[in-house]
């Protein structure tokens, strides 16, 4: 198995390690049913001659290895742009999963406080490098943006449905 190391935001690296490696250190093997697997596959390229092999990074990824197509022994380089794209996708995965848990809690009658839901989420994936308050603030911003979008949509419908 060919691996490569990349440097991303620490809490996102902890999230991926917790999600796919069950909080164990070492290389992370991403299942081929995941969108992230296919994104990494698309970004894999030949290592340029002037670029050295990096042995530093906070996330070690086992590169996708399919029967046909790119051989990871040759196509084992992820550029700076590729790392940014992978990090953005991981951040979207993280936010989508966290926000859906918080919204489910709201839909079910708000049995738990939001801070407790965030704490449970952080403990599930072994995330220690970001505070619960920061994630809660992120969720409140997201929720407010959804509410504003809904209001704009209702105003437009009201404006254009005048008969």
Predicted regions and their residues:
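Positively charged, polyanion-binding regions of nucleic-acid-associated proteins
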Residues: 87-109
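Short, basic interhelical loop/turn and adjoining N-cap
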Residues: 120-136
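Short, basic alpha-helical nucleic acid-contact segments in DNA-binding proteins
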Residues: 138-153
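Intrinsically disordered, low-complexity basic tails/linkers immediately adjacent to helix-turn-helix/homeobox/MYB/SANT
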Residues: 153-163
